């Protein structure tokens, strides 16, 4: 008779940890044995410098299982109160079509993909982004649009920067209409300070008194007024200045588009196109400009090109504008944008089509007209003469009573000064909403009937000269998918073109494409998290308050910092926010002349781009032959900067994939010269539980929650880049003008539109830490084990360029293909494209060293998947040998022909290698074949023939 087990014996230990880690204990031992090691502890001892080791357990609560973690988080969510929020200010309730919710937002085929640097395996989301760009172009009336920015306020700041780059005016002054949203004004002011621009915020009648290089106008403005902007735009153009207009996207279905009014740049938020408010984000900003300014535009642009067979193929265009190439000379520091949310907004337009969108806009406007007429009949005056969905009302001494009445109805209004209240209707509003508002403003005995008012209130709130008369969304894609069946199949067709984590590992160095567990993702669509307005009273967001405070405590414990600022919406924005904190700190000590930022030559391109945005002078520090920061060069340049030294930006482990032994000494050099140390957190996944940035000597660091802490990359966003700071920098991090944050100085400007950035995805990172607890260190150790295993297995075929003590790498390694290219002409790009035929996304290409591939396997990939990648790389090396030996011509071989498509093998095959060698090179590909949608994309053609809108459907055939 078998022995009965007790409940404690039947409880599965480390349940989630074992789900999160790819290799099980037996596989880990096999991997360690291949390295000549007996334990992970031995590996870490050989790899991580002893001087920086964190030799105790993380101060985190014990790990919860998935059910318990979800239950606890559900308890937090239950403390949020989802009221009817009519606050507006760029945030509106919306209805996400369930076919999009289920098949995009909740679908790992969409949310686990990476930025489409490899277009051949990203044609689906590239097409979705092209739809978003076409939607933006049509609704704004301009020539060109990008594929999203972080939020409306950031987009406004980018518009200011673009205006300065292209304006022929010699002025250094930018004008902001005081009727722009206050959070936008704050972010623009913050950015202007970094750039050294003068900023004037005032009424538009003051514009004539200034010479400016550009101006920002709101349409409709923050109080709902709709003004004809043509006289102001003409005035700006007369002085060679640019007109930048922040517009409400839904209103543009009924209003004359700003491009037709003469605007040079139009920007705004696409949030109300099906993306929940989420207590502030994430949301995709749209950004459009005139064709003349295309090379000055920030962010990603999707363009139409052709592939090797001459077929239509999409790609990211004009990448030479961007930070990963131009560094401190880049147009922007944008890296992560908001691709997943842009896709949702674009699909919202595809699903509803032009007629459906117009009906939504007309309905919102009609309800607003009925409300305006009813209130006016009872003597409540309207401040804004014209309107789309927003009313600003004079209520005088009744303000307090009306606010209390609204609270009784669980309605949030916008509270303004001077006895005024504001409200904005949205697509979730209906007749009952209007009736409730009549009750709030007039009392229950108002006697108004919505149906009667609907028949009587014929007048539009939009002035006739500003009614839209041009067509929009005329491309067939916006008319072909209005049934759920057709939409579902369209989404699936696009998804099938792409390669994401749900199909294979994505070994991108410096990107940490780890598991995004389903239990971590579930809470983001809970209504209690998804449907809160970011400016709702704090007591209505008590659950968010608990979640954010707890997450901040955990991140402090993990990093050693004293305080966290959650506002940055991406890693690059975290860099910018951290550098601003350093700048403010120096200024508080009357050392405002400290503006030199030292950056290692190996740094990610966002580092110098962010430093330039923060008003700093970038000085490059060289690296030695081992890939480490050249300590003597660092000392010399710190000495030369002297009292002008602001900071050092350093990545740890380095972007070369090693733990630099001298990192503490590097920090000491900077501190001895009065500078601060900014640690780029891109590689934090190799530190958690093993070392802490603050202990090493960092004063500030950003944490990529979309890397280390499991927020998915979304095909290019969303991301989150909160910063950790030591106590002396804590007063100088970002604050917010609408929702003041405890801790930072009140005068500190915002860096993003919402006080806690993209708050609705914070539950993902909360869940990850709650599920792992102190065992987060296990994840770091297994990530290091996986990287060293790959390095060991591949080093005989592809030399590992850099290694640290005992020949070990950190969590990633760089494979050097330069010798092979010199011998055979086979490049790192050829290998990257060939990996697609094996069913893999390529490693990071030519960063940080040209001619190399940087591989990061993460802790989440099984040994079987690692071995499959090793098999693919060794097979590719054998193919290169065939070229070396002359068996295949230098220009006719599987690498130069890669990637191969179904179209290749269904036509005439006249190549020096077989079809099987081309498309079925391994047993796995014969059983589970992924087909790239297009052949190799012609990048040069795409940039020389720039076209960034939807192409005729016939061109795809």
From Swiss-Prot:
SUPFAM superfamilies referenced in this protein's UniProt entry, alphabetically = PLP-dependent transferases (SSF53383)
Naming one, the record's GO cellular component terms include: cytosol
Q: What GO biological process terms does the UniProt entry carry, in alphabetical order? A: glycine decarboxylation via glycine cleavage system
Record-linked Gene3D superfamilies:
Aspartate Aminotransferase, domain 1, Type I PLP-dependent aspartate aminotransferase-like (Major domain)
Modified positions (N6-(pyridoxal phosphate)lysine) are 707
The EC code for this enzyme is 1.4.4.2
Molecular function terms from GO: glycine binding; glycine dehydrogenase (decarboxylating) activity; pyridoxal phosphate binding
Q: What class of enzyme is it?
A: oxidoreductase
Q: Which cofactor does it need?
A: pyridoxal 5'-phosphate
UniProt keyword terms in alphabetical order: Oxidoreductase, Pyridoxal phosphate
Q: Which InterPro entries match?
A: GcvP, GDC-P_C, GDC-P_N, GDC_P, PyrdxlP-dep_Trfase, PyrdxlP-dep_Trfase_major, PyrdxlP-dep_Trfase_small
Reaction catalysis annotation: N(6)-[(R)-lipoyl]-L-lysyl-[glycine-cleavage complex H protein] + glycine + H(+) = N(6)-[(R)-S(8)-aminomethyldihydrolipoyl]-L-lysyl-[glycine-cleavage complex H protein] + CO2
Write down the CDD domains for this protein, in alphabetical order. Answer: GDC-P (cd00613)
PANTHER family cross-referenced by the UniProt entry: GLYCINE DEHYDROGENASE (DECARBOXYLATING), GLYCINE DEHYDROGENASE, DECARBOXYLATING
Annotated function? The glycine cleavage system catalyzes the degradation of glycine. The P protein binds the alpha-amino group of glycine through its pyridoxal phosphate cofactor; CO(2) is released and the remaining methylamine moiety is then transferred to the lipoamide cofactor of the H protein.
Subunit field text? The glycine cleavage system is composed of four proteins: P, T, L and H.
Q: Which family does it belong to?
A: Belongs to the GcvP family.
Protein name, entry field: Glycine dehydrogenase (decarboxylating) 2
Q: What gene, per UniProt, encodes this protein?
A: gcvP2
């Amino acid at each position: 008779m078998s022995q009965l087990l007790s409940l404690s014996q039947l409880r599965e230990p480390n349940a989630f940890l074992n789900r999160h880690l790819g290799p099980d204990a037996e596989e880990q031992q096999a991997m360690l044995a291949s390295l000549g090691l007996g334990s992970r502890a031995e590996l870490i001892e050989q790899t991580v410098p002893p001087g920086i080791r964190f030799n105790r357990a993380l101060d985190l609560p014990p790990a919860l299982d998935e059910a318990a973690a979800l239950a606890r988080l559900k308890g937090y969510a239950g403390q949020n109160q989802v009221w009817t929020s009519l606050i507006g200010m760029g945030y509106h309730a919306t209805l996400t079509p369930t076919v999009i919710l289920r098949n995009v937002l909740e679908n790992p085929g969409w949310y686990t993909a990476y930025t489409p640097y490899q277009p051949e395996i990203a044609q689906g989301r590239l097409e979705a982004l092209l739809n978003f760009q076409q939607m933006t172009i049509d609704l704004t009336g301009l020539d060109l649009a990008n594929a999203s920015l972080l939020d409306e306020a950031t987009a406004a700041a980018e518009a200011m920067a673009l205006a300065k780059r292209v304006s022929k005016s010699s002025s250094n002054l930018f004008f902001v209409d005081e009727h722009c949203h206050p959070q936008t004004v704050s972010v623009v002011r913050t950015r202007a300070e970094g750039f050294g621009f003068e900023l004037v915020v005032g009424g538009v009648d003051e514009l004539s008194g200034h010479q400016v290089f550009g101006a920002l106008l709101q349409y409709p403005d923050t109080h709902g007024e709709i003004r004809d902007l043509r006289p102001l735009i003409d005035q700006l153009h007369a002085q060679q200045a640019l007109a930048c207009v922040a517009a409400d996207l839904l209103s543009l279905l009924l209003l004359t588009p700003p491009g037709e009014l003469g605007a040079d740049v139009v920007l705004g938020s696409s949030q109300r196109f099906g993306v929940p408010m989420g207590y502030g984000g994430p949301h995709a900003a749209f950004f459009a400009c005139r064709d003349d300014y295309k090379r000055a535009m920030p962010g990603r642009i999707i363009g139409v090109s052709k592939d090797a067979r001459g077929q239509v193929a999409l790609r990211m265009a004009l990448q030479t504008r961007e930070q990963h190439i131009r560094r401190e000379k880049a147009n922007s520091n944008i890296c992560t944008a908001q691709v997943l949310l842009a896709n949702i907004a674009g699909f919202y337009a595809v699903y509803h089509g032009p007629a459906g969108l117009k009906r939504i806009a007309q309905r919102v406007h009609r309800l607003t007209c009925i409300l305006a007429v009813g209130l006016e009949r009872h003597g409540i005056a309207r401040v804004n003469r014209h309107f789309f969905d927003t009313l600003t009302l004079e209520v005088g001494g009744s303000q307090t009573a009306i606010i209390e009445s609204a609270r009784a109805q669980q309605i949030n209004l916008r509270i303004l000064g001077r006895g005024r209240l504001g409200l904005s209707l949205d697509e979730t509003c209906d007749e009952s909403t209007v009736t409730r508002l009549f009750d709030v403003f007039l009392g229950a005995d108002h006697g108004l009937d919505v149906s009667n008012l609907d028949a009587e209130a014929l007048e539009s709130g939009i002035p006739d000269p500003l009614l839209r008369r041009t067509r929009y969304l005329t491309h067939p894609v916006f008319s072909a998918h209005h049934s759920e069946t057709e939409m579902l199949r369209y989404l699936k067709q696009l998804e099938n073109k792409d390669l994401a984590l749900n199909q294979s590992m994505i070994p991108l160095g410096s990107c940490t494409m780890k598991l995004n567990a389903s239990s971590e993702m579930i809470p983001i669509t809970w209504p209690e998290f998804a449907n809160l307005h970011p400016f709702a009273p704090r007591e209505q967001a008590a659950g968010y308050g608990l979640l954010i405070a707890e997450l901040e405590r955990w991140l402090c414990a993990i990093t050693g910092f004293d305080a966290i600022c959650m506002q940055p919406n991406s890693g690059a924005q975290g860099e910018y926010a951290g550098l601003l904190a350093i700048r403010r700190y120096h200024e508080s000590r009357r050392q405002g002349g400290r503006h030199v930022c030292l950056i290692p030559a190996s740094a990610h391109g966002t580092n110098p781009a962010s430093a330039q945005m923060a008003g700093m002078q970038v000085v490059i520090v060289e690296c030695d032959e081992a890939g480490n920061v050249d300590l003597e060069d660092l000392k010399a340049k710190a000495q030369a900067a002297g009292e002008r030294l602001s900071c050092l930006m350093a990545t740890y482990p380095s972007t070369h994939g090693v733990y630099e032994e001298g990192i503490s000494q590097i920090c000491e050099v900077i501190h001895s010269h009065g500078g601060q140390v900014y640690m780029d957190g891109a590689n934090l996944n190799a530190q958690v539980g093993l070392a802490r940035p603050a202990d090493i000597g960092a004063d500030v660091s950003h944490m990529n929650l979309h890397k280390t802490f499991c927020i998915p990359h979304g095909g290019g966003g969303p991301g989150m880049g909160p910063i950790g700071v030591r106590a002396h920098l804590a007063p100088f991090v970002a604050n917010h003008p609408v929702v003041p944050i405890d801790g930072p100085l009140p005068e500190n400007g915002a860096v993003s539109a919402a006080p806690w950035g993209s708050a609705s995805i914070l539950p993902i990172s909360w869940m990850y830490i709650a599920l792992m607890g102190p065992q987060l260190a296990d994840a770091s150790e297994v990530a290091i084990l996986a990287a060293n295993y790959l390095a060991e297995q591949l080093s005989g075929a592809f030399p590992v360029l850099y290694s640290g003590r005992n020949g070990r790498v950190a969590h990633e390694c760089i494979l050097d293909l330069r010798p092979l290219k010199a011998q055979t002409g086979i490049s790192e790009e050829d290998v990257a494209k060939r990996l697609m035929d094996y069913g893999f996304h390529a490693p990071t290409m030519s960063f940080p060293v040209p001619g190399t591939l940087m591989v990061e396997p993460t802790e989440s990939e099984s040994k079987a998947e690692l071995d499959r990648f090793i098999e693919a790389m060794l097979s590719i090396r054998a193919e290169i040998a065939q070229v070396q030996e002359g068996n295949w011509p230098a220009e006719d071989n599987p690498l130069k022909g890669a990637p191969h498509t179904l179209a290749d093998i269904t036509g005439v095959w006249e190549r020096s290698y077989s079809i099987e060698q081309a498309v079925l090179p391994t047993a796995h590909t014969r059983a589970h074949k992924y087909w790239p949608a297009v052949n190799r994309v012609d990048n040069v053609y795409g940039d020389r023939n720039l076209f960034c809108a939807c192409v005729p459907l016939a061109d795809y055939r």
